[in-house]
From Swiss-Prot:
Keywords: Cytoplasm, Exosome. GO terms for cellular component: cytoplasmic exosome (RNase complex). The keyword Cytoplasm applies. It comes from Pyrococcus furiosus (strain ATCC 43587 / DSM 3638 / JCM 8422 / Vc1). Component of the archaeal exosome complex. Forms a hexameric ring-like arrangement composed of 3 Rrp41-Rrp42 heterodimers. The hexameric ring associates with a trimer of Rrp4 and/or Csl4 subunits. Belongs to the RNase PH family. Rrp42 subfamily. Pfam families: RNase_PH, RNase_PH_C. Non-catalytic component of the exosome, which is a complex involved in RNA degradation. Contributes to the structuring of the Rrp41 active site. The gene is rrp42. GO terms for molecular function: mRNA 3'-UTR AU-rich region binding. GO terms for biological process: rRNA catabolic process. Its main location: cytoplasm. It comes from the Archaea. This is Exosome complex component Rrp42.
């Protein structure tokens, strides 16, 4: 057995003993998030942006929007692409190069939560059907990894989309000419999907796992919900099995915690709007 395995075993026993006493390694309750800080409009050259701090986990999200062609199978819909970059400075386990499995999973789950909830109305991003649409890029940079990247990125992505302002566009059907105006407008964001992540450690479920908890967890479950009462994404990873009653508890808790996080995002947006006036 390697030294790393011995240390992991000791840490697992320590965390499990705390959980048996209804405690966590950082004194939070099982359903408590670490402090969440959201600041929008932090990247001047981006259409929208957000800096999110979830405890010591920190992510930066930028929104870029251009005009382009729609996909052939969806001529009446705009395009949205999500990319996650795990900056090597954020964690010793992150390496430079193309996105690894972790980055791909993070991008897919966040993208799915936004897409399936129809939070960003892609149909309203069409300039000329089948010809010209808005193309929106959600670019995520992980600056510091101390656990639960999924929720931090999810918060940052929707906050940045809500913060985004894009130039208005006029299309002349007769000439096919496009005029990009100086006047700006928000993206058609109509819902605020929020992901809530649970770590299963032994027989216990805890919200917003720290890096130490993630390193010894038996499984992870992320549930994305919107304010209309719908679930738009579910992701189980890191092995492990979840009982039906555990999933039902997680769903109920996800709706409750998402409402709290939604208020934090809206407060950050209101604060930014007030500072501009």
């Amino acid at each position: 057995m390697s030294n790393d395995e011995i240390v992991a075993g000791i840490m697992r026993d320590y965390i499990l003993n705390l959980l048996k006493e209804k405690k966590r390694i950082d004194d939070r309750g099982f359903e408590d998030y670490r402090p969440i800080e959201v600041e929008v409009g932090v990247i001047e050259k981006a259409e929208g942006s957000a800096l999110v701090k979830l405890g010591n986990t920190q992510v930066l999200v930028g929104i870029k929007a251009t005009l382009g062609e729609p996909f052939p199978d969806t001529p009446n819909m705009g395009v949205m692409t999500t990319n996650v970059e795990l900056v090597p400075l954020a964690s010793p386990t992150f390496e430079p190069g193309p996105p690894d499995e972790r980055a791909i999973e993070l991008a897919r789950v966040i993208d799915r939560g936004i897409r399936e909830s129809r939070a960003l109305n892609l149909e309203k991003m069409v300039i000329a059907p089948g010809k010209i649409v808005r193309v929106v890029f959600i670019d995520v940079h992980v600056l510091d990894h101390d656990g639960n990247l999924m929720d931090a990125i999810g918060i940052g992505a929707i906050a940045a989309l809500l913060n985004a302002r894009v130039p208005k566009v006029l299309y002349n059907e007769e000439t096919g000419e496009v005029e990009i105006l100086e006047e700006k407008e928000p993206l058609p964001v109509e819902k605020i999907p929020i992901s809530v992540t649970f770590a299963k450690i032994g027989n216990y479920l805890v919200v917003d796992p720290t890096l130490e908890e993630e390193q010894i967890m038996d499984g992870r479950l992320t549930i994305t919900t919107d304010e209309t009462g719908h679930i738009s994404a579910v992701q189980k990873s890191e092995g492990g099995a979840f009982k039906l009653e555990e999933v039902m508890y997680a769903v109920e808790t996800a709706f409750k915690k998402a409402e709290e996080i939604r208020k934090i995002i809206l407060n950050a947006l209101e604060k930014a709007n007030n500072s501009e006036e």
